[in-house]
Amino acid sequence: MDEAVGDLKQALPCVAESPAVHVEVLQRSGSTAKKEDIKSSVYRLLNRHNIVFGDYVWTEFDDPFLSRNVQSVSIVDTELKAKDPQPIDLSACTIALHIFQLNEEGPSSENLDEETENIIAASHWVLPAAEFHGLWDSLVYDVEVKSHLLDYVMTTVLFSDKNVDSNLITWNRVVLLHGPPGTGKTSLCKALAQKLTIRLSSRYRYGQLIEINSHSLFSKWFSESGKLVTKMFQKIQDLIDDKEALVFVLIDEVESLTAARNACRAGAEPSDAIRVVNAVLTQIDQIKRHSNVVILTTSNITEKIDVAFVDRADIKQYIGPPSAAAIFKIYLSCLEELMKCQIIYPRQQLLTLRELEMIGFIENNVSKLSLLLSEISRKSEGLSGRVLRKLPFLAHALYIQAPSVTIEGFLQALSLAVDKQFEEKKKLSAYV
């Protein structure tokens, strides 16, 4: 019996013994080197560094070929599911190498002309875009939001590849992120599109991101005719028809759908308003049938999301304000950047929250500054991620105004900036 069990264990694949480690290789914009040559050089680099600790980035290389052609080699996303960085034995892992170059052209506008009106219907990026480089890493969440979203899209690709019967098992390729303003929902959608374009670069040559302008889409101009909506989605269909492209359609503030429906029911808008909303839902139903499209949507007002749209979403993820632990990570990344740029000088080592926990939050010369940052993080709870990323700038502008500052001085300024932010918030709410 034991022998049979042993044979069975050998026959079954053991995923845990050979985890996949994703390595992103940013090729220089002017480089014309072949991907196979870059791949060989990167493998040699990785073979020389068998053990790494969590995510790791190389920007300087002994190999002249890599120096000429590669801007960075990054071991990424190892910390998405693990609470803390873990040592990784690269020799025991399956390496997934993703080589890419950034598109530096910036967004273009998709215009729709209606008589004399020139309506900007959407913004369009070719991915991976220089504008979104580093955005994924800057977003910090308390739950495994990023890993769940990555796994979701990878599963849609797998099910499509295996020709799973969608009549038996349904999936719509629609993601809905909802929560209060300033929590990074739109940024996460853009970062996800960028990340997946890189992750699937061996399958799709490039990505396309279309951000639909909801405010224009549901204005009186668009409400006059569903034909314009059809025309806009036809442009999107043209992009989807290129099977070398992975297409992301981003609809921000999707609660506008509900606003248009309710206005029509109340008699405040012409009947065309309901037709334009139905046209959008119909077009979404048509494009989601294609295997190379993902529809990303956001909403600031959870209770007002149209039920017809909610039913279409495979994932409905709430994105709330960051906790003190997430705020600590956000501030820590800001301080690291300011030390790198020598605005905070001299550089000093800060402990992570996990390291503070391991020493029982005891104050000493090593932990003093990190404990102060932890205290500032706790009193910052209630502020949005958008505000938190602005606070280091405001701290410098309001309380420092010098080319460089010590970390002690900066933390004092940051604490004052947090206090001021809450004071202003209180004053504003008094007038609402």
UniProtKB/Swiss-Prot annotation:
- The entry's ATP-binding residues are G179, P180, P181, G182, T183, G184, K185, T186
Q: In which tissues is it expressed?
A: Widely expressed, including in testis.
A GO molecular function annotation here is: ATP binding
Q: Which UniProt keywords apply?
A: Acetylation, ATP-binding, Differentiation, Meiosis, Nucleotide-binding, Oogenesis, Spermatogenesis
Record Gene3D superfamilies? P-loop containing nucleotide triphosphate hydrolases
May I have one GO cellular component term?
Answer: male germ cell nucleus
Q: Where N-acetylmethionine occurs along the chain?
A: M1
One GO BP annotation of this record: synaptonemal complex assembly
Q: Which CDD domains match?
A: RecA-like_Pch2-like
> Which InterPro entries is this protein grouped with?
AAA+_ATPase (IPR003593), ATPase_AAA_core (IPR003959), ATPase_AAA_CS (IPR003960), ClpA/B (IPR001270), P-loop_NTPase (IPR027417), Pch2-like (IPR044539)
Q: What happens when the gene is disrupted?
A: Mice develop normally without obvious somatic defects but males and females are sterile due to meiotic disruption in meiocytes. Homozygous mutants display small gonads and females have few or no follicles, due to oocyte elimination between pachynema and dictyate. Mutant testes display reduced populated tubules and spermatogenesis is mainly arrested at spermatocyte stages of epithelial stage IV, corresponding to pachynema. Different phenotypes are observed in the different knockout experiments tested.
Family assignment from sequence similarity: Belongs to the AAA ATPase family. PCH2 subfamily.
| Quaternary structure and interacting proteins, as annotated | Specifically interacts with the ligand binding domain of the thyroid receptor (TR). This interaction does not require the presence of thyroid hormone for its interaction. Interacts with proteasome subunit PSMA8; to participate in meiosis progression during spermatogenesis.
What is the annotated role of this protein in its UniProt record? Plays a key role in chromosome recombination and chromosome structure development during meiosis. Required at early steps in meiotic recombination that leads to non-crossovers pathways. Also needed for efficient completion of homologous synapsis by influencing crossover distribution along the chromosomes affecting both crossovers and non-crossovers pathways. Also required for development of higher-order chromosome structures and is needed for synaptonemal-complex formation. In males, required for efficient synapsis of the sex chromosomes and for sex body formation.
What protein name does the entry list? Pachytene checkpoint protein 2 homolog
Q: Which source organism?
A: Mus musculus (Mouse)
Chain's gene name: Trip13
